[in-house]
Amino acid sequence: MADDAVVEEGSVEVSALAAGRPSWSWQRPGERARTPGRKAEDKEWVPVTKLGRLVKDMKIKSLEEIYLYSLPIKESEIIDFFLGSALKDEVLKIMPVQKQTRAGQRTRFKAFVAIGDYNGHVGLGVKCSKEVATAIRGAIILAKLSIIPVRRGYWGNKIGKPHTVPCKVTGRCGSVLVRLIPAPRGTGIVSAPVPKKLLMMAGIDDCYTSARGCTATLGNFAKATFDAISKTYSYLTPDLWKETVFTKSPYQEFTDHLAKTHTRVSVQRTQAAVQPS
C-alpha cells in the first residue's frame, strides 16, 4: 500500500517530475527565494554520432531520409531537431517493481511513456529507475529513440487525406495479440484506452481493433499495439510496386564533410588538452 501511495503521489505532477524539479517549493522564514537553474534545453546540442553531425549541419533535411536508409538513431536530439514542438508525450503508467535481495526487497519504479506528433510518427518508451522522475525522463528519451513512421491509408475510395490503417495488421507481445482493421471515415478509433492513445498519437483517425490475451497487463498491451502500428510499412501493397531508385547513403554522400568536421573537432579537443589550466 505504501508503494501505491508513492506512485499516486509521483503521478500527480508528471510535467514537474519529468523536468526534474519538485511540484512544490518550501523555504525557511527570512530565507531568500532560490532562482531556478538553467534548463537542459538551453544548452547547445553537441552531436556525438555521424548522423547527429549531418543533421545539425543540415545535410539531412527530414526524418524520412533517415528511415529510407534504415539508419539507427542514437541521439534523442535528432528527433527534437526535426519534430520539436509538434511532439506530445503522455505517461501511460507508473508501476512499482520489486527485486528480492539478501538485504530485503528493492523497490524501483517502471514508467511507460507514449510519444507522437499526431501526424505519422509515434514512439513507446519503458524505463525502470529508483525515482519516478528519473524513470519518466529516461522513458521519454527511449520513446524518442524508438519513434517509427506510420503508414496510413483509406477504407474505400481514395478521397481526401489518408485516415486509417492501409490494411489489416497484427502485433503481438507476450500473450496479448492486437489486430488493427481499416474503418470508414468518421468511425473514430474503436478500441480500449491504451491502443486508442497510441493510435491517436500516430495520426490514425478511424480504426477498428481486436485484442486477445491478458490485456490487463498494460505494458504488453501497449507493446503489442506499437508492434502492429510498426507493421503498416511491412506489407508491400500494389501502390508500392514501382521500382525505387536508391541514391547513395548519407554516410557515403557526405564522407568528405564528415572527415573534415571530425578532424576539426579532434584538433580542438587536442588544443584544449594541451593548454595549461
From Swiss-Prot:
Q: What is its main location?
A: cytoplasm
Sorted alphabetically, the keyword list is: Cytoplasm, Nucleus, Ribonucleoprotein, Ribosomal protein
Q: Which GO terms describe its cellular component?
A: cytosolic small ribosomal subunit; nucleolus
Which Gene3D superfamilies does the annotation name?
A: 3.30.160.20, 3.30.230.10
Which GO molecular function entries does the Swiss-Prot or TrEMBL record give? Answer: RNA binding; structural constituent of ribosome
Q: Which InterPro entries match?
A: Ribosomal_Su5_D2-typ_SF, Ribosomal_uS5, Ribosomal_uS5_C, Ribosomal_uS5_euk/arc, Ribosomal_uS5_N, Ribosomal_uS5_N_CS, Ribsml_uS5_D2-typ_fold_subgr
Q: Where is the composition biased (Basic and acidic residues)?
A: 29-40
Q: Which proteins does it associate with, and in what oligomeric form?
A: Component of the small ribosomal subunit.
Q: Function of this protein? A: Component of the ribosome, a large ribonucleoprotein complex responsible for the synthesis of proteins in the cell. The small ribosomal subunit (SSU) binds messenger RNAs (mRNAs) and translates the encoded message by selecting cognate aminoacyl-transfer RNA (tRNA) molecules. The large subunit (LSU) contains the ribosomal catalytic site termed the peptidyl transferase center (PTC), which catalyzes the formation of peptide bonds, thereby polymerizing the amino acids delivered by tRNAs into a polypeptide chain.
User: What name does the UniProt record give this protein?
Assistant: Small ribosomal subunit protein uS5
Gene name, Swiss-Prot/TrEMBL: rps2
